[in-house]
């Protein structure tokens, strides 16, 4: 299964957007995402970092991922900035439990 995961307020707190240098990890969510990686799922992080400012945050984000122990296959920085995302395959971290794979079916 290919799983796209947002970064800010999903696997880290970013209290001073757009200054991502002060972001800090949400360890519990990183562990959940890493478990999905370890189970063989393809993990792609997709972020809107720099979408409004034009700043390229790739190098800094990759450094943060290394420091935080984030496992992933790909990092995409071209996510558009939006206020609300409505989708048929969406999940909120408040309800994140790795049993969702069994609930929706695993095409891995």
Q: How should these model regions be labeled?
A:
Residues 1-108:
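Catalytic phosphate/metal-binding cores of nucleic-acid and nucleotide-processing enzymes, i.e., regions
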